[in-house]
């Protein structure tokens, strides 16, 4: 049986809030959640998202996470191709980088 992996929407942070930077000691490109202060070329890691809008349409694209509001379970994302900034509700996220998200 070939199923795609599923996660709870509460684990969304592990997929959306990654950083990418160049390590000054080794010169290698690193990926993680907290970058050191001495890191160079620090930028957010892009990810593919598919989510449901408030009007019921499915929207998708490659974007980066700009900010998170944990009390409202919302995050601001900027689409890479268009530069459009949108607010996405965590419970309406269907898929991130091939991993399906479910609500309880």
What residues fall within each predicted segment?
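Structured surface patches comprising rigid loops and adjacent beta-strands/short helices at the edges
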Residues: 66, 87-101
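A sequence-level detector of short linear motifs
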Residues: 31, 59-60, 87, 102
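Small/flexible residues
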Residues: 6, 77-80, 88
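Short glycine-rich, low-complexity segments
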Residues: 1-57
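Short beta-strand-initiation
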Residues: 44-46, 72, 88
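HINT superfamily self-processing domains
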Residues: 2, 15, 68, 73-79, ...
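Acidic/proline-rich low-complexity IDRs
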Residues: 11, 70, 91-93
């Amino acid at each position: 049986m070939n199923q795609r992996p599923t996660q709870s929407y509460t684990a969304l942070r592990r997929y959306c809030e990654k950083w990418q930077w160049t390590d000054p000691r080794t010169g290698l490109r690193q990926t993680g959640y907290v970058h050191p202060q001495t890191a160079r070329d620090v930028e957010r890691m892009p990810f593919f998202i598919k989510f449901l809008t408030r009007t019921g349409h499915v929207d998708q694209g490659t974007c980066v996470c700009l900010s998170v509001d944990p009390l409202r379970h919302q995050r601001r994302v900027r689409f890479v191709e268009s530069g459009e900034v949108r607010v996405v509700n965590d419970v309406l996220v269907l898929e991130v980088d091939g991993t399906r998200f479910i609500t309880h």
